[in-house]
UniProtKB/Swiss-Prot annotation:
GO biological process: carbohydrate metabolic process
Binding site residues for a beta-D-glucoside: 47, 147, 336, 406, 448, 465
One Pfam family, short name: Glyco_hydro_1
UniProt KW Glycosyltransferase keyword: no
Signal peptide bounds: 1-25
E.C. numbers: 3.2.1.21
Entry GO MF terms: beta-D-fucosidase activity; beta-galactosidase activity; beta-glucosidase activity
Keyword Signal: yes
Protein name: Beta-glucosidase 21
Positions of disulphide bridges: 212-220
Glycosylated sites: 219, 224, 407, 494
Amino acid sequence: MERPLHLLLVFLSSPWLLLLQGVSSLQFTRDDFPHDFAFGAGTSAYQYEGGAAEDGRTPSIWDTYTHSGRHPEDETGDVASDGYHKYKEDVKLMSEIGLEAYRFTISWSRLIPSGRGAVNLKALQFYNSMINELVKAGIQIHVVMYHMDLPQSLQDEYGGWISPKIVDDFTAYADVCFREFGDRVVHWTTVLEPNAMAQAGYDMGILPPNRCSYPFGSNCTAGNSSVEPYLFIHHSLLAHASAVRLYREKYKVAQKGIIGINIYSMWFYPFTDSAEEIGATERAKKFIYGWILHPLVFGDYPDTMKKAAGSRLPIFSNHESEMVTNSFDFIGLNHYSSVYTSNNNNVVKAPLQDLTADVATLFRVTKNDTPTPVFVPGTIVDPRGLEHALKYIREKYGNLPIYIQENGSGSSSETLDDVERINYLAKYIAATLKAIRSGANVKGYSMWSFVDLYELFGGYSTWHFGLVAVDFDSEKRRRQPRRSASWYSEFLKNNSVIRVEEDGFVSAASHAQL
């Protein structure tokens, strides 16, 4: 049910008192979180850096995708937020806001332009300089090694992630990252959102590397929607586990870091209380959460997936199962919203079937929406969904250490007076605290995003997620902090009081981000 957003800022000298409606009534400050909990914000290399053809960087699959005209807005990330040139200014802004942590990704095709072999010295200078700036600012560093930007050379050579050859190349790339940056980087994430990339990139072909097959996807020049999503995840897990083993054997004693993997998360509510709808909801959870977490905890894929995909689902050898099991120190969670789910009665078992048919579930953002068989990012503000997701993980897979690595609200408006974003963030931060008090082992929270970015589906003009606005019409990509940056700063630096009142679902601007 749609309800208006309500926000009242009451200034009682200092700190601020923020009254919001959202999760059940809760009043809190920064000090209510554990002493080692870190609040931050994030960016991603292709969306942030720019400098696409500078200093030895070579094309990634994202460059190929956007330059082929497949992006809906026909825009590229060639300049993006120009972080390649403006990172020092950005770190200064982070410090002024009071960020305790910053999560960014490394561009593989910048660091190792050929995908393997020689390291780009200019890239080393860039990442070392940025890391050093963060260290000087006292900001905790969280590095992601891969987010959908494979060097195009490896995609051309052997098909990238659908080939087992990727395991050795990714491990060698990770080795360079650990060796060059690990003396200052403590928090490592191997792969970001593989469960989302599987459908978007390899079943539907709507994101890089734009692989799909008829009749399941369209506008693809190559691919196999029946098997490639499963190969991609399988090799992602093996590459992740190989990198973790390398880190633990070669670097962990000296560097004392931790390493994990990230999953895209949404919460699912059955459309009705029927057994059929509840079954579809549980099946969707297995494909979103269990596809990654089940092998990491139990060494194999969920039985639900084995039954649905059959022989198309790869099998772990005993050695691979042992390597994958417990190959993490934490799980990164990207969470934005919730959706309604129902059984897809139109799916009939056929010799040729894709991931979407295997899930056999329909999704609705609201109960009045037309259902779609594709995992659809939600647009409702539902902080309880985050609580449910954390509880589900704890009950099914144990009380795993979790970093919320992305959570945020996007708006089509470029306004600096982003009250809706403040509303959203306050509710989800409150939900995080409630989950911690209920026993969830959440170690950190990173909002999405630090600055406005080149958005994966929306380009420059459709959605703006940043605490800091970026003028994409300006050659200098001028920065200007939004009201949400001031609010976040008051919470982090001045221990301002936030009170969130119970309300339930609240409709807001889209905050879905893959």
